[in-house]
Amino acid sequence: HLPARAEYLEAKRVELATLGHSLSGQIANHDLAPLIQHAAHALKLANPDQMQSIEDLALCLEEDVALMQDGVLSAICFCFPSSWVPAERIGMPLGQIHEHVADGQKLVAASPKIAHVMSDLEQGSFRRYVWTITNSPKLSQHPSHKNPNIPITIEDLYYRVETQTTLPLPSIAGRS
């Protein structure tokens, strides 16, 4: 994972205070604290056994956090999504999460293989980059922050790159 910068973590805190329920969540009626603590240990974070929520974990990292179990999104805390509402994806498999993105059908078709690679302990962690063109320079691209301005020139457009780091975790209690 990336070293966490204080100003970035503060921006995450502000965004969570503003839009918290739409940015994060977990599958209802599931105690995910053991999985969250397991992830915190794997990431070598300070005080991993004190983490009780996905927000606790996310506020220790620059990266947004999604936890998949058995191919389903169990918990998420994405403070700066690109025009989507993270909490709406809870309980969905990887393919369904990405149905509405560019080239979504290709991604949906490849999702079983992608999910397998993402959980492959032998492969270990990997980093990938996702890009988009947007009409706002703001870090938060949440749908509630939509910029109504229509770009007129190329100078009105912004290139946005997201870093995604995948870290497969060893199974705990029969789940991964």
Question: What does each model-found stretch correspond to?
Answer:
Residues 1-176:
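Extended, well-ordered protein cores
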